[in-house]
């Protein structure tokens, strides 16, 4: 197995573990009888660990090396899954779920920033001299997205039809991760340890602020809208099938995203961003129609279009970051990019809070309008070729 493939396997494993909880949220509401607010808090505490994991892990790997950060993150994800498996034990269920989700947030943040940078560096000479310039971004995005999709698919199916529904999904992740750890141990280090150039500060080029930042929140906001908001918008139409349906939408969204990412290599980052935002607008309008008609069937193609938008935007953002980042700050800038993408995860919470005022069909149209504004901004600012910016000395 080539070095970049083994590093990408780490991204797959961490994405699998991080997102397996998505399809299990319905189970905790229906079988463990947690309120919707409590289950949302389980989801939110993950973000509380993720952001510091990203913002500290990326720059730290620029200083100490990729393998020294990624391997411990993978190892810690094993007991984190073990703690989540205690969610089925009534006496410790709630604190176990909070603790496990927070731990997963931290290790996912570290692994996403470090693993993406590592895959990029292993997708060039001397490790892979035949790879094209965008191979690193594409490989990292596909591996992460495949993990994000496989985790909830397997977990949802096991929770629906296998024994031990609150334990077995996490055990599968533990076995997978142990195998990946063994594969990653021998991957070459691409970033030798050295002195910090500027502590933990990360230089943000003007193009990042003008082109990448307006698009980035939609990269993860898109799938969140697809498989978190649509089931909620359809409500009673899913009686008895909520877990399976949420798993279906998650799989369609992320599966289409993976397929599109393989094709996105042919596009420039700006074109990918524009097409991604345009697809998101279209997908949200279809989702609004599905919510207005109460049609679970129509929500499936909406998820497919939104998944295509996700795939295009994630790759486009990573390509922009990897082109503009200095080698010494690749991990740090990648971390900032991912941190901004996760801003999009507030959208389901915001729409849930507003649903009593306007209703999901109207809210989804409103979000489509906001995505259209972002499309206009990116289309305008992306026309200008920015001069290369270097961080200030010292």
Question: What does each model-identified segment do?
Answer:
Residues 51-93:
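Conserved MFS/SLC helix-loop-helix module at the cytosolic interface between two early adjacent transmembrane helices
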Residues 100-144:
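Cytoplasmic helix-loop-helix junction between adjacent transmembrane helices
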Residues 310, 318-368:
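A late C-terminal transmembrane helix in Major Facilitator Superfamily
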């Amino acid at each position: 197995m080539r070095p970049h493939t083994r590093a990408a396997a780490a991204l797959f494993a961490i994405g699998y573990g991080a997102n397996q909880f998505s399809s299990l949220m319905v189970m905790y509401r229906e079988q463990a009888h947690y309120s919707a607010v409590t289950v949302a808090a389980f989801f939110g505490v993950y973000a509380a660990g993720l952001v510091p994991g990203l913002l500290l892990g990326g720059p730290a790997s620029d200083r100490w090396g990729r393998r020294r950060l990624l391997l411990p993150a993978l190892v810690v994800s094993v007991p984190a899954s073990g703690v989540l498996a205690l969610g089925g034990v009534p006496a410790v269920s709630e604190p176990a779920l909070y603790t496990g989700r927070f731990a997963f947030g931290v290790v996912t943040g570290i692994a996403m920033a470090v693993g993406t940078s590592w895959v990029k560096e292993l997708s060039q000479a001397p490790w892979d001299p035949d790879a094209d310039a965008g191979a690193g971004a594409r490989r990292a995005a596909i591996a992460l997205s495949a993990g994000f999709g496989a985790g909830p698919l397997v977990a949802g199916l096991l929770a629906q039809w296998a024994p031990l529904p609150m334990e077995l999904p996490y055990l599968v992740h533990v076995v997978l991760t142990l195998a990946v750890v063994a594969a990653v141990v021998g991957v070459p280090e691409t970033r030798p340890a050295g002195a910090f150039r500027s502590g933990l500060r990360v230089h943000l080029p003007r193009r990042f602020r003008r082109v990448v930042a307006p698009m980035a929140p939609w990269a993860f906001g898109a799938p969140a809208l697809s498989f978190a908001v649509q089931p909620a918008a359809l409500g009673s139409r899913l009686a008895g099938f909520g877990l399976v349906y949420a798993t279906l939408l998650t799989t369609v969204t992320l599966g289409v995203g993976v397929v599109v990412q393989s094709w996105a290599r042919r596009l420039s980052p700006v074109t990918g961003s524009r097409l991604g935002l345009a697809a998101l607008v279209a997908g949200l309008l279809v989702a609004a129609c599905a919510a207005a008609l109460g049609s679970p069937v129509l929500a499936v193609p909406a998820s497919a279009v939104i998944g295509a938008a996700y795939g295009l935007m994630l790759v486009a953002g990573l390509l922009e970051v990897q082109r503009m980042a200095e080698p010494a700050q690749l991990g740090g800038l990648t971390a900032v990019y991912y941190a901004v993408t996760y801003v999009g995860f507030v959208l389901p919470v915001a729409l849930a809070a507003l649903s009593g005022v306007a209703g999901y069909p109207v809210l989804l149209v409103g979000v489509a309008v906001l995505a259209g504004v972002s499309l206009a901004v990116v289309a305008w600012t992306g026309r200008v070729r920015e001069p290369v910016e270097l961080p200030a000395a010292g």
